[in-house]
């Protein structure tokens, strides 16, 4: 009956179904999943179950709904998580959910870093399920708001052990009804003077640890393959950008891959590559589009400045297109 909540069509892989079932029976703990193993879908499926946990009769008597917080290490990832959640959570009739972002980034959803505004938003939307997306830097704002949190997911949870984030992490570990730490690379501490994810009072025990070889064997992720290229060092900084261009273009020609990710040392290196060399011309001559995004420059697609939402929509569209070549 559609009046009783949401309708979700999420097909889980076996290890994801195992994780979701484990979360059902534990209120706190660590979920160790290799990169590409689908941690986000586990969060979404668990959130679906939480949103559907009350029947309509109960809601009429007690309209307080679930509040779920999702923590990401960076604003861009918080926005991407929001897109993933909202894409899969389809509301039906009166049981709609509301979305709030607590960080300084741009979003077309309601957004704030003010404690009083967070409190007011929660009170104003008490009849709705609530999703709050934030970063580790801004999590303390939600802590200061002292709102009731039913479930909190820490994405890339190894970031939470940083000195500036420990207080808020410990707070929600203690006061949230359900608290889960998702990561592919748990960070432990060998000294009692520094917090690590082996502090089980804060992080709980490891609920599930999915081995990477298992996912490789089942075809869910690809094993890493490393090819090392030797390049000549250029002492004259005047030619460094051209050297970067020649190196990257020749590598693209050699590997002959349609979709390429380039990791640069800095924003300056990216800007110099696309503006001070023939890199973009070389890409176009080979049938490649190009895009980049940094905190300093914002998002650019084929030389045109776009907003973050357009950037990620384009990235998803190109990524799904087997015929599209892009860097």
Where are these regions (language model features)?
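Conserved helix-turn-beta segment of the N-terminal RecA-like "Helicase ATP-binding" lobe
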Residues: 77-111
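Conserved helicase ATPase core of P-loop NTP-dependent helicases/translocases
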Residues: 114-122, 291-327
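Walker A/P-loop
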Residues: 26-46
